[in-house]
Amino acid sequence: MIDRYKHQQLRIGSVSPQQISAWATKILPNGEIVGEVTKPYTFHYKTNKPEKDGLFCERIFGPIKSGICACGNYRVIGDEKEDPKFCEQCGVEFVDSRIRRYQMGYIKLACPVTHVWYLKRLPSYIANLLDKPLKELEGLVYCDFSFARPITKKPTFLRLRGLFEYEIQSWKYSIPLFFTTQGFDTFRNREISTGAGAIREQLADLDLRIIIENSLVEWEELGEEGHTGNEWEDRKVGRRKDFLVRRVELAKHFIRTNIEPEWMVLCLLPVLPPELRPIIQIDGGKLMSSDINELYRRVIYRNNTLTDLLTTSRSTPGELVMCQEKLVQEAVDTLLDNGIRGQPMRDGHNKVYKSFSDVIEGKEGRFRETLLGKRVDYSGRSVIVVGPSLSLHRCGLPREIAIELFQTFVIRGLIRQHLASNIGVAKSKIREKEPIVWEILQEVMQGHPVLLNRAPTLHRLGIQAFQPVLVEGRAICLHPLVCKGFNADFDGDQMAVHVPLSLEAQVEARLLMFSHMNLLSPAIGDPISVPTQDMLIGLYVLTSGNHRGICVNRYNPCNRRNYQNQKRSDNSYYKYTKEPFFSNSYDAIGAYRQKRINLDSPLWLRWRLDQRVIASRETPIEVHYESLGTFYEIYGHYLIVRSLKKKILFIYIRTTVGHIALYREIEEAIQGFSRAYSYAT
């Protein structure tokens, strides 16, 4: 059983048959070895007790009730004086019934069986390692053809006669017909190989280091050839090079994890603990069983039939043996991944059986729903809404959620400040929502980040840290620039909020997970906090400098005509309105706030002389002279005031309040980055 305090991670991979046997086999106090499931039965229909050596056997998986054996005898668990520790009649140990949650069994397969995940899933690991087409391997696994054994050291009858090539489709129909079971088995063990056993032999004969060396040499040779000019040939070479890279990476992974390639072919099939595939009795005496039990029964039935053909019958044609091996392979495929080879297996009500893959994968699978999707303490969930006034690293938490998440911290603060004598008094103050509670909550939240998560968490930016602030309402406020990392929008999306408790978690959240420290995509390095949608429209309206706004465009001529009519009627206004001059941006924004000018009204703003805007060859549109000798050179977007000696006195640029506001925001941001950089250096 996994100790949650000693194990911090879980790795899924291939294991050896010896490891499977060690997990599932146990030795009883009388020296008897149990663990192999040999019968396809579950419960006896009369006694309603598990069948011996069946899928729910108490000898293999442990007692159903703690300390009670199959005979009904009782022993105190953990009492060393009680002897013996198991029932001598039924062989059931007197242990805790929770052992049935983790005690495994195994099925000894009569023939090797290829693990369908490694064969049929793309990319096929077995096909990559053997460097053979997937169709050819499938035909070999499912006994569609055979081949002469390439690893036999002794000269064989077929090799001496030279009658057959590497692959011969007709062997399937010719050879088995002339051999009985015993003769065919001897002939096959020496002369030919078929089924998953052939795959296992080839995988066992592989040298992974030689595969890496040969693949690298071939990759370099293909790279030296260069482009041939033929597009089809170049693509073929490119696909081959990609395949060699995948093959090298796969071989390195096997070496690094100490996994042998032949472990991808099963000789022992693990049987899940009974509590993970239960049979439940419902009202009316009916039984509900996990689909995996029926799939296990199918495997055991076919495996026992094959065992009988190989051991008891001596006159069975070899063709029947090969056919039964194929049925065992298909039964194990259905158990591991139902429907991967075509039509899935269904029950009497035309319902598809749920295999291991269906139980594990997907949103409702074991990992995402049960292990990763469990409800946890110090967490909440609510709809997100836009918070444009928030900083990039802040989020708005509703008061209702915040007081629940930080309740223990608030209680500690109330007791430390002697505002409550005990926990009960502190909780009553929180229920009554006294003003002092919100003050302490503000103090607690200032130094405590929170984690926001939006499912599905597909990459690192799916969970980010924020500094929480209290907001009114019942929705979480989020800065719009962080939405792309979460793949979120404000059309009803929900996000979960978590409170990191330990000091290590808080440090990790502050140093690695804060939103303003994750501005680039971890996948491609491009900026991920970029304005989109509403922000782009707002920037356009802010800097358009157009009285018509965004409602008029070339696709809406009606409004343009109305605007032109309005412009003709108010021609005198446009003709005689004087554009105001401002010495600095503060005066311009102040005039806008006093409603003396509009957001898009053109104006002249004095510019600094050190920031030149003059084009070298640009000529003025108009020149105005004054009586004192100064004159104004008017250009398209700026104006220059010169003295009598043509010295530049002032420079004005033609802009709007919207442009000024955007420029000031950008300037403040640049100055902030500069200060932060200077502090860092």
Curated annotation (Swiss-Prot):
It comes from the Eukaryota. Its cofactor is Mg(2+); Zn(2+). It comes from Solanum lycopersicum. One of its GO terms (molecular function) is magnesium ion binding. Mg(2+) binds at D489, D491, D493. It holds the Pfam family RNA_pol_Rpb1_2. DNA-dependent RNA polymerase catalyzes the transcription of DNA into RNA using the four ribonucleoside triphosphates as substrates. Zn(2+) binds at C69, C71, C87, C90. The gene is rpoC1. This is DNA-directed RNA polymerase subunit beta'. It catalyses: RNA(n) + a ribonucleoside 5'-triphosphate = RNA(n+1) + diphosphate. Keywords: Chloroplast, DNA-directed RNA polymerase, Magnesium, Metal-binding, Nucleotidyltransferase, Plastid, Transcription, Transferase, Zinc. GO terms for biological process: DNA-templated transcription. Its main location: plastid. HAMAP family: RNApol_bact_RpoC1 (MF_01323). Belongs to the RNA polymerase beta' chain family. RpoC1 subfamily. In plastids the minimal PEP RNA polymerase catalytic core is composed of four subunits: alpha, beta, beta', and beta''. When a (nuclear-encoded) sigma factor is associated with the core the holoenzyme is formed, which can initiate transcription. Transmembrane segments: none annotated.
